[in-house]
Design a protein with these regions (language model features):
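Alpha-helical scaffold segments that flank or form the walls of functional sites
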Residues: 38, 63-181
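A very general structural signal that marks isolated residues within well-ordered alpha-helical segments
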Residues: 53, 188-189
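Conserved small/polar residues in nucleotide/adenosyl-binding loops
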Residues: 182-188
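An N-terminal structural lobe/cap that precedes and organizes the functional/catalytic core
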Residues: 10-93
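Short, Lys/Arg-enriched N-terminal segments with co-localized hydrophobic residues
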Residues: 1-8
């Protein structure tokens, strides 16, 4: 098992075949199939993106509000390791948000990023950090504020507004529902 210290300064490596079968015959078929469909527009039948984000198309306020607070995969993992939801900015059942400082929330996330090792969530986060935000090192308590500031600067640019990201990822249709800590609602379909 890799230690927290080794992970804290590790580079983000995205291996080209990370989602393909290790068996070489199967992998070659997977590569061929992927090469034929990789540029097809995305039709996403499931998601947790608040449709208001796309309809309003406002700048994201900060990295914590974008990546941590609305993502139940992230905050539930941290909660399972003893971190209070309130300290992560997740609103209470009555809608009140206890921790409102996004830098504190981000620091907790980065300090505990090593907990995501070996999970699909880390694979997704590593992709987002490296490919979307051009971050080379895994987030850690040592670089938390540098990573935060870097992302914060990008979030103030037009090409990081929700509709720009939607278009950049070639999303044609996104079916979504409310965030996981609200009452269940009917799905919303957002299409270009």
């Amino acid at each position: 098992m890799r230690s927290k210290e080794r992970l804290s300064m590790s580079k983000i490596n995205l291996y080209n075949d990370r989602f393909f079968e290790p068996d070489s015959k199967t992998r070659s078929v997977a590569r061929e199939l992927y090469s034929k469909i990789k540029n097809v527009p995305i039709v996403s039948p499931h998601g947790h993106v608040d449709p208001k984000i796309l309809s309003e198309n406002k700048y994201f306020s900060n990295p914590a509000d974008l990546l941590i607070i609305p993502d139940h995969y992230i905050f539930r993992m941290l909660y399972s390791q003893g971190i209070d939801l309130e300290s992560l900015g997740v609103p209470c059942a009555n809608g009140i948000q206890i921790e409102k400082d996004p830098r504190k929330i981000w620091n907790i996330f980065c300090k505990n990023y090593f907990l995501f090792s070996g999970t699909p969530t880390k694979m997704w986060l590593d992709y987002v950090f490296k490919e979307v935000f051009e971050i080379e090192e895994s987030p850690s308590e040592h670089n938390a504020m540098n990573v935060y500031d870097h992302i914060q600067n990008l979030l103030q640019k037009d090409n990081f507004k929700p509709r720009s990201i939607f278009d950049r990822f070639n999303i044609e249709t996104l079916c979504t529902t409310a965030v996981s800590y609200t009452h269940l609602t009917l799905p919303t379909i957002y299409s270009v």
